[in-house]
UniProtKB/Swiss-Prot annotation:
InterPro entries reported in the protein's UniProt record: Rhodanese-like_dom, Rhodanese-like_dom_sf, SelU
Name listed for the protein in its UniProt record: tRNA 2-selenouridine synthase
Family: Belongs to the SelU family.
Pfam families listed in its UniProt record: Rhodanese
Gene: selU
GO biological process entries: tRNA wobble uridine modification
GO MF term set: transferase activity, transferring alkyl or aryl (other than methyl) groups; tRNA 2-selenouridine synthase activity
Originating species: Escherichia coli O17:K52:H18 (strain UMN026 / ExPEC)
SUPFAM superfamilies according to UniProt: Rhodanese/Cell cycle control phosphatase
Length: 364
């Protein structure tokens, strides 16, 4: 039964999206997990806590005995059934616990007794996590080109279309602004970093990578922050700025934030609740920048948002949203981005409309 030990083995697991049966407790999994992992714990949170307390008070033998007592009979059988099904569904997968210690070895042994030989990660999640951190540090050293531009410039799409592009907002499940949240909850910080590392490793493995194409992001993307090694390199990177006509930007924003988000909410929650969630999403985004807008301006825009939502509900038209979106761009988002760009003006190496920037990036 081959078990993996080397740094290259760990990297290969991440590049291949090897299915990982992670037998740690749910609380550990939520704090940080690998992208291709599924959580089928040997012990639940309460059982793990009880065994941990026993270990501190009575030692390892007593803790092991308690663990076997807690995971016995019908409970053990239910978990065995889940592991067996996962192994059969993922024959190329691998077992993982915190450090490649007792938990993954116990599950491996029980599976062997049931006629299934399944490998485990020697070193466990900790080894994979260290590999992810080291890979990000190493790969961040390659040159970077940032795609900049005001809100609605299509920066994310441009990055997505590059073979050497990494969509940081997609990985973070957030579009980086007050209106940036998606219907998917954001990952824990460690899980986000692991996902980013795996994406960088896979992108690098597919080609002779000369440089990265990334969106010009701030340190925070929603609740996730960029790894410091990557953030530091991004502050030194060249910037290509998309400068599209205002009307084209409005069309993109209408599609992304009104038409698509309304569709996504109603698809997820049904027409009635989906509409309420969509309205709440837009109001929450506007409310998040209330202090910067000032109370009077916020109240004016919030009233225009309500009017636009009423129009959208009754007619299906999203045109009414321009009444609050246009001033929001002209008074808040555009001046803020231009101010930020001025501070790094010496880094700007190209400016043009979307297609021109896309062509320039391909030539690099």
């Amino acid at each position: 039964m081959q078990e993996r030990h080397t740094e290259q083995d760990y990297r290969a697991l991440l590049i291949a999206d090897t299915p990982i049966i992670d037998v740690r407790a749910p609380i550990e999994f939520e704090q940080g997990a690998m992208p291709a992992a599924i959580n089928l714990p040997l012990m639940n949170n309460d059982e793990r806590a009880a065994v941990g307390t026993c270990y501190k008070q009575q030692g390892s033998d007593a803790a092991l005995a308690l663990g076997h007592k807690l995971v016995a009979g019908e409970i053990r059988q239910q978990r065995m059934d889940a592991w067996r099904a996962a192994c059969l569904q993922n024959p190329q997968g691998i077992l993982c616990c915190a450090r490649g210690g007792q938990r993954s070895h116990i599950v491996q042994r029980w599976l062997h007794e049931a006629g299934i030989d399944y490998p485990l990660v020697d070193g466990g999640y900790k080894a994979l996590r260290q590999t992810a951190i080291q890979a990000t540090i190493e790969l961040s050293q390659k040159p970077i080109v940032l795609i900049g531009g005001c809100t609605g410039s299509g920066k994310t799409l441009l990055v997505q279309q590059q073979p050497n592009g990494v969509d940081l907002e997609g990985l973070a499940r957030h579009r980086g602004s007050a209106f940036g949240r998606t219907l998917q909850p954001q990952l824990s910080q460690a899980s986000f970093e692991n996902l980013l590392a795996a994406e960088m490793l896979k992108t690098d493995a597919r080609q002779e990578l000369r440089l990265w194409v990334l969106e010009d992001e701030s340190r925070m993307i929603g609740s996730n922050h960029l790894p410091e090694c990557l953030r530091e390199r991004m502050t030194q990177a060249a910037i290509a700025v998309v400068e599209d006509p205002f009307e084209i930007r409005l069309e993109r924003l209408n599609e992304e934030y009104f038409l698509r988000m309304h569709h996504d909410f109603t698809h997820a929650y049904g027409d009635e609740q989906g509409w309420q969630e969509y309205c709440e999403y837009l109001h929450h985004g506007l409310s998040a920048i209330k202090r910067r807008l000032g109370l009077q301006r916020y109240n004016e825009l919030a009233a225009q948002l309500d009017t636009a939502l009423t129009t959208q509900l009754t007619t299906g038209s999203t045109d009414g949203h321009l009444a609050w979106l246009v001033p929001l761009l002209e008074e808040y988002y555009d001046p803020m981005y231009r101010y930020q760009l001025e501070k790094k003006a010496e880094k700007v190496v190209f400016r043009g409309e979307w297609a021109e920037v896309a062509e320039w990036v391909k030539a690099q």
